[in-house]
Amino acid sequence: MSEQVKEISQWIIKGDHDLGTAKITYFHIPEYLDTVTFHCQQAVERYLKAYLIFQSTSFRFSHDLIYLLDLIIQNDSDFENCYDTVSELQGYAVEIRYPNETIYLSNEIVDQAILIAKKIRDLVTEKVKIKIDYNEIIDK
């Protein structure tokens, strides 16, 4: 396994941990909507960074999903249709982590955040052609 494949795999696995944490939390403590959406955003961020490594594209470490998508799209227009969905998660990286920020969340928003993270994961793993087992038992 090349170093690049190893690094990509590590980023995907970290994203899977975030997505798994989001789903387990939502299942067991459904009131923690902010925590669930935060982990969905983190999962998408890590999946996008995995793809940037696949592209050999340098990036600054940032929670800005639009910035990461902009970099990806410079070399792969297949991600252009992700802007609208990924932008829904943009505010869940930092702002939602602080008590003085008010972001309205509902079960529908959380369900959508989980779905977005899963779709981005599917797109990235398909593109990088790395199969990483994903625990679908906890899927809702």
Could you tell me what each predicted segment is?
Residues 1-140:
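Terminal alpha-helical segments
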